[in-house]
């Protein structure tokens, strides 16, 4: 049986993203040379929300892009197991990242493997001056030496728990961060 516990509701997510937006601005001393890149899928929507808040706070339209890490993963998934053709969705970074302070955005930080793949993919696009990481939820259990620079909420979990982020933009359900516990 699976038990679900809501650890962040819509209001908590909004507050966390507002705080993270201020932290990004403060740490980067404004928005000069700043860019946001969301990791598909939910990272894209979170990057857009951070973009909107930074625009409201600073009045500056920071460039936003998204990155597909499919070909960079060490657990490559395939759209067809027979042909072993990877399910690639495409990267959309409509600006030059060279010399930019890029904030990679994702929903949950777990082992660090997704972030490693995203950094590899980003470096194939260009050479940013800095790469920072913003996540809505950090659940621990790292397998690689990667940490988030901006965290919405630290959510300690056990090995049999899973953290799920639901966003209205993609899931057609109310915004929430949920821990699914196997009992």
UniProtKB/Swiss-Prot annotation:
GO terms of molecular function: RNA binding; uracil phosphoribosyltransferase activity
Coiled coil: none
SUPFAM superfamilies to which the protein is assigned, alphabetical: PRTase-like
GO terms (BP aspect): DNA-templated transcription termination
InterPro entries per the UniProt record, alphabetical: PRibTrfase_dom, PRTase-like, PyrR, PyrR_bifunctional
Enzyme class: transferase
Residues spanned by motif PRPP-binding: 102-114
Annotated residues for binding of substrate: 41-42, 106-114, 139, 163
Ligase recorded as keyword: no
The entry's keywords: Glycosyltransferase, RNA-binding, Transcription, Transcription regulation, Transcription termination, Transferase
EC number: 2.4.2.9
Catalysis performed (reactions): UMP + diphosphate = 5-phospho-alpha-D-ribose 1-diphosphate + uracil
Family per record: Belongs to the purine/pyrimidine phosphoribosyltransferase family. PyrR subfamily.
Subunit relationships: Homodimer and homohexamer; in equilibrium.
Role this protein plays: Regulates transcriptional attenuation of the pyrimidine nucleotide (pyr) operon by binding in a uridine-dependent manner to specific sites on pyr mRNA. This disrupts an antiterminator hairpin in the RNA and favors formation of a downstream transcription terminator, leading to a reduced expression of downstream genes. Also displays a weak uracil phosphoribosyltransferase activity which is not physiologically significant.
Name under which the protein is recorded: Bifunctional protein PyrR
Organism: Listeria monocytogenes serovar 1/2a (strain ATCC BAA-679 / EGD-e)
Underlying gene: pyrR
